[in-house]
Amino acid sequence: MLIAAHPDDESLACSVVLQHAVCAGAAIRVIYATDGENNPWPQRVLECKWRLNGTDRERWGKLRRSEALAALDVLGVGASRASFLALADQKLTELLMSGCRVTLKLLAAIVADWAPTDLLVPSISDTHPDHSALAVMLRLVWSEYLSAKGAMSAWSYVVHGRSSAFFDRAETIRQTTVEIAAKLRAISCHKTQLKLSRKRFFDHAGRSERLIKLNARETIDADGSISSISRRPRSLSIILQRSLRPMCPRKPALFILGHDEVGALRCARMQVPLRSSRVEIFDQANDEQFAVGRYSGDAFAGELAIPVGIFSPVHALFVKLERRGWFFDEAGWLELPAAVHPGPLPGEAFTAEQPWVPADKIENVVALR
């Protein structure tokens, strides 16, 4: 099962993988989270229309659906194997941070009902905001809803960006000239995207596809301007090393997604100041301030200390520094595993190497690259 944020992801990142699955006789399903309907610049150019309304975007989304089905056909995957969830394009980060429980249950039901042996999902290191947000949702689904995974394996892929957090660990998929040619034909089906991005799209055909196998207790290395994260007894410490980004006019905002003490999803938002000062922490869902942290440093380097008690220690934390230049993010999300495990994960038993450790006795560090 391949889960993609947009029509065209299947061709850009997983064409060869899908061809291998077809040759192996595997059953295949492809799930598209959005229709890619909020894609204004190519639509304006192709339709010679500056102002786009809801009807225009709906029409564009249907066109992109048809392109995806044509690309799948080139790769040997029938149209009946594709499903479209029609989530709002360019809004997946907002959905993730403001309440996505219904979407998580939908995704969990889709995966559980079909029970694939291999699940391909976007990487949280992808620099497209929709891709990394969908990746976080699927990690939440993986950890919270799919307790009986059985023999299911999950793999992540990247479409956008060259994050070392992904590429330094990814496995390369072997590909033949025949498979590359089919990938080019699949990419060529996405005519709406080739008008403005032909070179960028065709460049994907010359790159080897890469995957990372996801682990149950995975730490994602530091990425972008975040050089390390550590849980301390009373605070979450985030070390920043920021470069100059002339295309980033706003103050960088830091987001932390986790669970509160009763297990509900909570997303904290804060502006990163340019000099040492207190930091007001807001709940992204209701825009209410609920905590105060401290920044020590300047516009280029420093440490954020955030009260660790605002999040449950038995769940993973996801952290993102938003410094968006034009459209793409500087980096995706980082994942810090749970500090406390109340019991073994499904299929695991406690060992001497995996004891239960109280929160005030553990320091969980994402090391500086």
Go through each PLM region and give its residues:
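The feature marks non-catalytic terminal segments
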Residues: 66-80, 97, 144-369
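Active-site environment of divalent metal-dependent phosphoester hydrolases
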Residues: 10-12, 37-40, 125-131, 163-165, ...
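Short Gly/Thr/Asp-enriched flexible loops that form oxyanion-binding sites at enzyme active sites
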Residues: 126-144
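A short secondary-structure junction signal
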Residues: 93-96, 131-133, 167-168
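Active-site rim/loop-helix segments in enzyme catalytic domains that contact anionic ligands
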Residues: 1-114, 139-152, 238-240, 244-247, ...
